[in-house]
Amino acid sequence: MGLTPMMRQYLEVKESCKDCILFFRLGDFYEMFFEDAKVASKELELVLTGRDCGLEERAPMCGIPYHAANTYIGRLVSAGYKIAICEQLEDPSASKGIVKRGIIKIITPGTYTDSSFLEENKNNYIMSFYLDDNMCAMSFADISTGEFNSTHSNFKEAVVLDEISKFAPREIVLEENIKESFIHTIKERFPNISISKIKEENFDYNIDNNLKEQFNNFNENEYETIVKKSANGLLYYIFHTQKNILSNINKIDYYSIVDYLTIDVNSRRNLEITENLREKTKKGSLLWVLDKTNTAMGGRQLRRWIEQPLINKNPIENRLNAVEELLNNISLQEDLKEDLKSIYDIERIVGKVASKSVNAKELISLKCSIGKVPYIKKYLSGFKSDLFLNMEQCIDTLEDIHKLLDKALLDNPSLSVKEGNIIKEGFNEEVDSLREAKSNGKKWIASLEQKEKEETGIKSLKVSYNKVFGYFIEITKANLNLVPEGRYIRKQTLSNAERYITPELKEMEEKILGAEEKLIDIEYKLFTEIRDFIEENIDRMQKTARIISDIDCLCSLATVALENNYIKPNINAKDEILIEEGRHPVVEKVIPKGEFISNDSLIDTKENQLILITGPNMAGKSTYMRQVALITIMAQIGSFVPAKKANISICDKIFTRIGASDDLAAGKSTFMVEMWEVSNILKNATSKSLVLLDEVGRGTSTYDGLSIAWSVIEYICNNKNLRCKTLFATHYHELTKLEDNIEGVKNYSVSVSELENEIVFLRKIIRGGADQSYGIEVAKLAGLPSPVINRAKEILQHIEGDKEENSLNIAPSKEYKSKDYIEVSKDTLNTKNNLGSEIKHDTLSETNTATIIEDESTKEHLSSNRKQINCRINDEKSIKKEVAVDSFQINFEYIKRDKIIEEIKNIDILNMTPMEGFNKLYDIINKTKDID
């Protein structure tokens, strides 16, 4: 039994899009079969049915109405799937055999343009990556807006990950033979990105001609070959999915990575630049604070400004001067903002023009938007700063386009461009004539209805229309006896009425419907001509849209500065960051107004190169460090900053090692990740960089951690090629001694007030190191039970009293009772031969107990050493006894060795991954380092 012709056709089409869900058009439905149907039915909550396909088993099938497809497509694309749209390419009624079908478009996460599923203030980027030896190139495009950016650099995974983090593409196009390990790295870090592969030849084919045809500004001699390959590969993929050349992608913008402030992946996350750490949403981020834009275009542009702060003084100061001028001209600023509120998303409307998917209502939105441009140009002429003057000279008012749209299109046209009711009266004579004929015909219909009512005496008689029968006379059954015999021709019988026609009615119907059909065709033709004219002028509209988005960004920064009492920073060349009464821009917005404690900062590359900050957890060290970084970023964006005064030197890179970055799911321990991040910073930071390091060394033993932190400080301060501006927060109070030994180290701490055994964090950074960590007080604030807090204080007193010795002398808690106890001297336990393996020590528990395993030899030995070991045992029959320690002095080297041996014995090597095994070995090696 063979496949049916339709199913053979389906499988042939499916062969060309194996990685897609195929929407196969059958009549008024898109049908999915086999595995596609199973996936779609699950994701879209559709009923899974079956269809005879010529095989023994029915083909799994589900379907959706074609007119509702966009909603379902959006859900699938949002879930990361690719959709191939297979349409009927001929009229089924005119086809003698099976209807010809073909794929007209492939919709992927990176090429989706439906505005209802795109974030209006965020680009939907697709990226291509090309690797050649030790060089790599990357291109980023947003086909909904027409942006196309390319760059290249020496290949480092960190560089690529940084750019991915910056642009946040939904999809990455790679050469099909690229190493799977690299793909794994990308997916591990960015699990929501879709990966697509194309052949090597698609990056190379007809490269210069393709780029010249696509980009108006392309000069083959200006670009490295690897950049051209990356761009060509991305253009191929866009054409392959969209099935046509998109005219809104008409300019390639090359950028150098070193032209912008580098903020690596971890720092973007830790500083919460565009999204918060917990929910991964905009609220609580720097973008959330700064975004007061009034247009979608401005929102996207501001995000780009924040993702790519500047490193050249002139453009930074141009933005700052423009913001300052807006603040000095509140009236003009308000006029600008009011007109910006009326501007729609010109970039994405123009993108729909390029893809031939724009409708008349969207062109009316375009008309309204560009109608505001002459007013904006007039407002710009009232400013004097260089940036605004340049904008005023460059902005195109697009008056010819506005005039055409205003003259041609109805103010409230049909949503569909193939239903008529688009063209305004007076624009085209033929349209006016057909509309009159259509109108006259309908007037004739109305007069016919009135005449028939009068002549028959049937007041309920009506002349109606539907698409199946056309025009007809309808009379209810209650009035059929009033119908004159032979007056009408019966057309249709209903349960409660009869429908009739007359020759005159059918004749007029042909005239009316003929006029309507012709009118729809002519209106559509005129609409496409208008659309084509706009497409020819896309470049002009895009330039104007970019200027509008820049104006919107500047107005947003001015609004935020005014609302939050920001000041204009001074951009200096002294390699110095000097901030007076600085505030964290986000934290001050989420706590009650006026409660944020401001702090001063002075960091340079000489006497104040490394600011060593000590103090308890929860006191505000991390907030303070992030505050300095965010103020620096804001200044380099061109924003005013939250401070009383700010002198900011331009940084080339910002690095952070703040907070837990555990990546246990990827087989990486806390300490391993921490050391990798520190290593990355030390290798890539320069003397122009700003580095934030928080609790370096915390993930390992105390002495290992202290040693590493100490060494890192020395390396940063003593390496002449580094000496970067650094904020270093630590719990290791021993490091405060480095101020006297290393040039550039300065001690600071968070001020704490002690009142009647209570502490108050004053959140103020003061000169000098902290003398204690207040860990127990923090635990108390966190809500630990009082018995635990009180016992911790007792233990701390003993530890601090014995800290100069290699022993602990800790009295038992009075809350725990036992009849049995043992006194063990330090010297006895140091003599391994005295006790051998007869005494086994459990890990010290919360009850401070030890365990003794007794046998006859042990008793005899203990008896002979009564001067060394005084032991009172109440129940000699007991083999295992719990004893409370009255005065317990114990050699920790012995316990550690015993614990490590036990830990090694318990390792289940057969059920470990290689990475888990490596981490366990690394952990054990660290533990043995503490044993002499």
UniProtKB/Swiss-Prot annotation:
Gene Ontology molecular function: ATP binding; ATP-dependent DNA damage sensor activity; damaged DNA binding; mismatched DNA binding
Signal peptide per UniProt: none
Keyword ATP-binding attached: yes
CDD domains linked to this entry: ABC_MutS1
Keywords in alphabetical order: ATP-binding, DNA damage, DNA repair, DNA-binding, Nucleotide-binding
A GO CC term assigned to this protein in UniProt: cytosol
Entries under InterPro entries matching the protein: DNA_mismatch_repair_MutS (IPR005748), DNA_mismatch_repair_MutS-lik_N (IPR007695), DNA_mismatch_repair_MutS/MSH (IPR017261), DNA_mismatch_repair_MutS_C (IPR000432), DNA_mismatch_repair_MutS_clamp (IPR007861), DNA_mismatch_repair_MutS_core (IPR007696), DNA_mismatch_repair_MutS_N (IPR016151), DNA_mismatch_repair_MutS_sf (IPR036187)
BP GO terms, sorted: mismatch repair
Listed Pfam families: MutS_I, MutS_II, MutS_III, MutS_IV, MutS_V
Residues where ATP binds: 615-622
SMART domains (alphabetical): MUTSac, MUTSd
Family under the similarity heading: Belongs to the DNA mismatch repair MutS family.
Functional summary from the UniProt entry: This protein is involved in the repair of mismatches in DNA. It is possible that it carries out the mismatch recognition step. This protein has a weak ATPase activity.
Name of protein: DNA mismatch repair protein MutS
Native source organism of the sequence: Clostridium botulinum (strain Kyoto / Type A2)
Record gene name: mutS
